[in-house]
Each structure stands twice: as C-alpha cells, then as structure tokens.
C-alpha cells in the first residue's frame, strides 16, 4: 500500500487473477508513470503445448490470455495510453491438424495476432485449408513471419528492417499499423 498515493499505480480495471494479468497491470502502471519502454516480452499463462486434453487446456489458456489482453487494452484506454501500445501474440510453433487421441502434435505453420488501437486488423495470408497439407502433414505457410517483423520494425518502431532481418529487401511489408 506504500504506492497507493500514486495514481499511476491505481488499477482502473479488473484483470484476471493470473500471472499475465498481473504483469500487464504492472506494465500499464509503468507506462502511466512515463517509463520510456519500446518493447516488452511476456509469456501467457496455461499450457498451449496440447499433446493431450487439448480442448480443455487450450480453451482455458486462451480465455485467460484474451481476458488479460482485453483488460490491458481497457486499462490503457482509461489512462489515455491506447495509441502507445501494440500487442503481438504468437507461438514459436503451430499445431498439426490431425488429432493424436485428445491433442495434436507440433506443426510448422501457426498464427500471430496484432492487437491495439493502432492495429489495422487486416488478415495477412490465407487459411491454407486442410486438404493440401505438406509432405509432413503440416498446414502450408501462406505468409512469411519475417514480413510481419519487417512491418512492425518499420511501421511501429520506425527502424529500417534491413540490418535486422536477413533477406528483408526481398520481403513484403503488410500494412499492420495505422498512422
């Protein structure tokens, strides 16, 4: 309670009682206090490595993550900071479409989401379908994840992606951020 007198540390919205919710609440307070942050990394609660019991594990984990991010967005909006933050959600691996009893194995293709008041909300790539899997029974990629990083570096952080992303010169730049 020693921070109770500082308005930036008062939480104006209710966050889920989970690690990600507490981390995002603290991040909102740091931003409200004027901390000059440009990039922060956090891990979501729950298990997304669903080789078994996928429906229950994935649904519960995804709900916790979505509820925490929604609370964070509402918190930023209440503090007038919504245009200062962009959130990228991603996994380092996808899932294969075929079930192995009650779950799925690691796969090559996955999804990423960009959220925030300045995110365009555009879908990049196309759903590859379930009838044209690759030779290892993975979903086929329909976009290169490096394009997303090039776009975020240039459109959000104002940095040239060339020195950071190998082969950036030959990659597209989907519009991910509104001016």
Regions found by a protein language model. Name each.
Residues 1-179:
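Ligand-binding pockets and gating/stacking loops
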